[in-house]
Amino acid sequence: MGEFTQKRLVRKLELELFLAKVAPQPKPQAHLEQYTVSEQLAANMLYIAAYTNDDIIGKSVLDLGCGTGRLALGAAFLGAENVVGIDIDRLAIKTARENTTHPHLADKVEWVNGDIDIISGKFDTVVQNPPFGVQTREADRAFLVKALEVGDVVYSLHNHPEADERLIKMLKSSKGFLQVEPSPFMQRFIYKHGGAIQAVYALPMTIPKMFDFHKKVRHDFIIDLYVIRKIANQSTSVSAPRYPTGKHL
């Protein structure tokens, strides 16, 4: 699955090409909201974590709801010290193991089939693409709570609070991302569970028609990447920071 890399700058295109070889979920289940992120979105997410914030290289990384391993393997490829990926879907974990073809990556990645509740211990970084909470209400919240319980920093994908066709077109044309403000609800919820939002990035995401209830051939929408730091002092102010808008990063 490409050349093993560690502790060197990896070009984003090189990362995308690596991630494109990670096979997606062969039999996605609607109730688990198993939507695979594109290699472009995953590369942007991991690039921010690795090179903007130095949260991947040499770190212990946990991928909650890892699916077939795109984020977990990407973190290992970029130079994480060790990676754990967990998913409740047995077939997803089987596919993730099959995706781990490079021996150097296999030595540093562990796959776990089970509910996220079984995870304990401490990790430097958590990356996750949790269920959006459409099929099972508030499903994403359990992932956030667990991530903040075991991780020092969390990179988590969530639905943008509103549809914005103009922003979607802007993001798709630039193939990049924009820094935006967090939703008030997310800010309160994250603080309640011991975290503070460092930044929020809007990224474009596309879901093809996968299930019977999907009405469109493809659905373009915005996904928000939340970068969250665990805080020791709950009295820390988490009033919404003023993020720059209209700027491609």
Regions from the PLM with identified roles:
Residues 82-87:
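Conserved SAM-binding motif I beta-strand of class I
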Residues 111-224:
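S-adenosylmethionine
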Residues 93-94, 164:
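Short alpha-helix immediately C-terminal to the canonical SAM-binding loop
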